[in-house]
């Protein structure tokens, strides 16, 4: 077995590597695994494999982490790396990982600086208050500019960077960094083989002045963070390395500033100091402190759990993945307590008991079975049947529900039609597996056509899902054109609407009367529906109230204009009547359903469409064409700015107008422009577009 899980949580870091798709995230992660792999490989003589053998084998396999979380060791510290994807269609994956990590390394391209995807991931990290250090990568690249990149962190992210290193040389001559904390040069001169140790040198003469200037800025920032340090510094005393690092750590953990270091992962330069910075400045589970949840069945009652083995067990499932040998792996972050393989736990989210089969921590090149799961760590569990992303697992005797993750509804759909009966069966298996892994993947059956309709967060997302069905599950199917996931809502309040459901067909009949109010509504947590019972005096027996709610929710699946789901409404049940013999749960369910449909027709129903936040980067000479094209797609231009010598146009554009955009953009700009697109919000469609949508849906 590899190195044991560290139980001293001061020596544990749960981190993510965040980056734009091309900033070098995979290479950076590979290098971290290699350098830390060397560290723990040395202690493993029993398998006779040398480090170089392992590296060759990894080269063949290409360590692009397929695991959701990888454990490695550095200088007697344990680092659990949670993988975060770099593409915009997978922002949910990013949110999912940010929810369970304690700190992150934001990787930037030293030439491009902060790019659109970096901005988005940075904002998501801010939402979960994740402390970050910044690694300016690709310093060996033509046109790389460390100081420009630091400025873009200020200008584009509105963040406060704290420079801890300066680059020595640039582009092909990038040889190392000046360490401003210890005032020394760390160099990797010439072509550096992977795994080579750096040389510690004097600061080069041409950088002494600049290093002194940045060192002074660093010391002033450190001194201002603590009264005792301020007195010492301004009293002319030297601050020790420990004092400087301690102050930087405190400010980083509080997200007051973001330490900036640099290197070239590809050229093996700057990786070891980056790992040192992860240990020195990013928080451990004890820094993060207790996790807050609520009582099972009562969201008003808050419960906390400390990151300690002595507390009752609690964990959050953050990713489901398929494994070729073990089947379904459930990745969890354990927040408190401990648990053994074979133990039974409560899935508090679903109210079901689950038995844990085996427990693993994933290493770069193998699964490492462990004897227990303890607070502060990330594990893969085997054997959980009903647990999905966002579920809480806990001690049955001390239940807690941790804050779950909210996922956006899919904005784009395609129909999928299996070619043969055997494909139909395989499709069923594929859909079940993919839905377990990805909470933004939706499936429904079109009752009219009998086709299966799948939904996702963008064209690329759906392309990848369909491709996985073909490759992994061998499903041959015809895939339809992408369709927009429209919604319907109401714009006016209906103060009072009554509906009586009455049926008499010999014997006992059916009777239920409801009086409801309907109004537009959006919940604070993004909820799109609320039911309030205002019935008093037993006019409707208590046991029938949930049936009215259930009937209304059923009716919301198919709107009143074009059959799209109804969202953003509140239904208040005001009054009603019942019959001792003829009333039933079914009768009140029908009444609730019909009352909602009729009231919605009177409440100014409209169709909503998904708007995408589109960002186009283009050479200046094509700016006019790009803006004209976006306007013709019903786009609203939000902002224009200059970035790295190019122009950037930000706009909100309906998704329905963005199909095939990449081809049009390339032809208009001779392939020199690119764009990114992410879901922003739903908005009401104009009347003329609404008419077309309704006509298409109703066939009129």
UniProtKB/Swiss-Prot annotation:
Q: Which UniProt keywords apply?
A: Cytoplasm, Elongation factor, GTP-binding, Nucleotide-binding, Protein biosynthesis
Binding of GTP, residues: 19-26, 83-87, 137-140
Q: Does the keyword Protein biosynthesis apply?
A: yes
- What's a Gene Ontology MF term here? translation elongation factor activity
Presence of keyword Nucleus: no
According to the entry, every stretch annotated as the tr-type G domain falls at 10-286
Broad class of where this protein is predominantly found: cytoplasm
List where in the cell it is found.
Cytoplasm
PROSITE patterns per the UniProt record, alphabetical:
G_TR_1, G_TR_2
Give a Pfam family name.
Answer: EFG_III
Q: Which PANTHER family match?
A: RIBOSOME-RELEASING FACTOR 2, MITOCHONDRIAL (PTHR43261:SF1), TRANSLATION ELONGATION FACTOR G-RELATED (PTHR43261)
As for family, the record states: Belongs to the TRAFAC class translation factor GTPase superfamily. Classic translation factor GTPase family. EF-G/EF-2 subfamily.
| Name of this chain's protein | Elongation factor G
Q: Which gene encodes it?
A: fusA
């Amino acid at each position: 077995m590899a190195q044991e899980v560290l139980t001293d949580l001061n020596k544990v870091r749960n981190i993510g590597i965040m980056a734009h798709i091309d900033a070098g995230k995979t290479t950076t992660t590979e290098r971290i695994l290699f350098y830390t792999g060397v560290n723990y490989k040395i202690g493993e003589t029993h398998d006779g494999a040398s480090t170089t053998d392992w590296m060759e084998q990894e080269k063949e396999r290409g360590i692009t982490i397929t695991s959701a979380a990888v454990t490695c060791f550095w200088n007697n510290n344990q680092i659990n790396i949670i993988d975060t994807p770099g593409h915009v269609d997978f922002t949910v994956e990013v949110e999912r990982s940010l929810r369970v990590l304690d700190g992150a390394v934001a990787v930037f391209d030293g030439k491009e600086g902060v790019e659109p995807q970096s901005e988005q991931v940075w904002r998501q990290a801010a939402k979960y208050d994740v402390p970050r250090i910044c690694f300016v990568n690709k310093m060996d690249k033509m046109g790389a500019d460390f100081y420009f990149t630091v400025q873009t962190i200020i200008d584009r992210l509105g963040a406060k960077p704290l420079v801890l290193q300066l680059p020595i040389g640039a582009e092909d001559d990038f040889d190392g960094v000046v360490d401003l904390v210890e005032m020394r040069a760390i160099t990797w001169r010439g072509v550096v083989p992977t795994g080579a140790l750096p040389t510690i040198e004097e600061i080069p003469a041409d950088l002494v002045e600049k290093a002194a200037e940045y060192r002074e800025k660093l010391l002033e920032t450190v001194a201002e963070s603590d009264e005792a340090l301020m007195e010492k510094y301004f009293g002319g005393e030297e601050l020790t390395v420990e004092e400087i690092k301690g102050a930087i750590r405190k400010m980083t953990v509080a997200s007051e500033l973001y330490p900036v270091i640099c290197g070239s992962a590809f050229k093996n330069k700057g990786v070891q100091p980056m790992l040192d910075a992860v240990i020195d400045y990013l928080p451990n589970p004890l820094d993060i402190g207790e996790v807050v949840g609520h009582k099972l069945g009562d969201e008003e009652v808050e419960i906390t759990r400390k990151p300690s083995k002595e507390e009752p067990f609690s964990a959050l499932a953050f990713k489901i993945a398929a494994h070729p040998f073990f089947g379904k792996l459930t990745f969890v972050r354990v927040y408190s307590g401990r648990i053994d393989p074979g133990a039974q736990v409560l899935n508090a989210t679903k109210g079901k008991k689950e038995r844990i089969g085996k427990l693993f921590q994933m290493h770069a090149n193998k699964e490492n079975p462990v004897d227990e799961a303890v607070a502060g760590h990330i594990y893969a569990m085997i054997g959980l049947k009903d647990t999905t992303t966002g579920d809480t697992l806990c001690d049955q005797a001390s239940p807690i529900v941790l804050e779950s993750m909210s996922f956006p509804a899919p904005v784009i759909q395609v129909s999928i039609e299996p070619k043969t009966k055997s494909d139909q069966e395989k499709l069923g298996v594929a859909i079940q597996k993919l839905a377990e892994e990805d909470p933004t993947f939706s499936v429904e059956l079109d009752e009219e056509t009998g086709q299966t309709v799948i939904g996702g967060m963008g064209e690329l997302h759906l392309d990848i899902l369909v491709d996985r069905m073909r490759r992994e599950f061998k499903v041959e199917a015809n895939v339809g054109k992408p369709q927009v996931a429209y919604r319907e809502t109401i714009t006016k309040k209906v103060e009072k609407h009554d509906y009586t459901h009455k049926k008499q067909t010999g014997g006992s009949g059916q009777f239920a009367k409801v009086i409801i109010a309907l109004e537009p509504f959006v919940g604070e947590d993004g909820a799109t529906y609320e039911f309030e019972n205002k019935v008093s005096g037993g006019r409707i027996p208590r046991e029938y109230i949930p049936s009215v709610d259930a009937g209304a929710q059923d009716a919301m699946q198919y709107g009143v204009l074009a059959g799209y789901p109804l969202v953003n409404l509140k239904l208040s049940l005001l009054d009603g009547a019942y019959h001792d013999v003829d009333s039933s749960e079914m009768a009140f369910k029908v009444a609730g359903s019909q009352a909602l449909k009729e009231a919605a027709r009177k409440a100014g129903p409209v169709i909503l469409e998904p708007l995408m936040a589109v960002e186009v980067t283009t050479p200046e000479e094509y700016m006019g064409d790009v803006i004209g094209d976006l306007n013709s797609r019903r786009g609203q231009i939000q902002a224009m700015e200059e970035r790295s010598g190019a122009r950037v146009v930000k706009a909100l554009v309906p998704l329905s107008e963005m199909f095939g955009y990449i081809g049009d953009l390339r032809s208009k700009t001779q392939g020199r422009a690119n764009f990114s697109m992410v879901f922003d919000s739903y908005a009401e469609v104009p009347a003329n577009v609404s008419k077309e949508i309704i006509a298409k849906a109703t066939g009129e």
